[in-house]
Amino acid sequence: MEPNPNRQPVELNRTSLYLGLLLILVLALLFSSYFFN
């Protein structure tokens, strides 16, 4: 009967996961650049 409150946390979790992956990728790029340099 109330799909909105159920969808919001799922979307937040997905966005948090995507943000975490992006942060990990950025950190990996920074570490790789430091190692290469």
From Swiss-Prot:
Main localization, broad class: membrane
Lumenal topological segments: 36-37
GO biological process: photosynthesis
UniProt membrane topology term: Single-pass membrane protein
GO cellular component, one term: plasma membrane-derived thylakoid membrane
Record key words, sorted: Membrane, Photosynthesis, Photosystem II, Reaction center, Thylakoid, Transmembrane, Transmembrane helix
Disulfide bonding pattern of the chain: none
Subcellular compartments: Cellular thylakoid membrane
Cytoplasmic side stretches: 1-13
Residues annotated as signal peptide: none
Residue stretches spanning the membrane: 14-35
Cofactor comment: PSII binds multiple chlorophylls, carotenoids and specific lipids.
InterPro entries on file: PSII_PsbL, PSII_PsbL_sf
Known function: One of the components of the core complex of photosystem II (PSII). PSII is a light-driven water:plastoquinone oxidoreductase that uses light energy to abstract electrons from H(2)O, generating O(2) and a proton gradient subsequently used for ATP formation. It consists of a core antenna complex that captures photons, and an electron transfer chain that converts photonic excitation into a charge separation. This subunit is found at the monomer-monomer interface and is required for correct PSII assembly and/or dimerization. This subunit may make specific contacts with lipid(s).
Family: Belongs to the PsbL family.
Quaternary organization: PSII is composed of 1 copy each of membrane proteins PsbA, PsbB, PsbC, PsbD, PsbE, PsbF, PsbH, PsbI, PsbJ, PsbK, PsbL, PsbM, PsbT, PsbX, PsbY, PsbZ, Psb30/Ycf12, peripheral proteins PsbO, CyanoQ (PsbQ), PsbU, PsbV and a large number of cofactors. It forms dimeric complexes. Part of a photosystem II (PSII) assembly intermediate complex PSII-I; crystallized from a strain deleted of psbJ, it forms monomeric PSII before addition of the oxygen evolving complex. PSII-I includes 3 assembly factors not found in mature PSII (Psb27, Psb28 and Psb34).
Name this protein carries in UniProt: Photosystem II reaction center protein L
Origin species: Thermosynechococcus vestitus (strain NIES-2133 / IAM M-273 / BP-1)
Gene for this chain: psbL
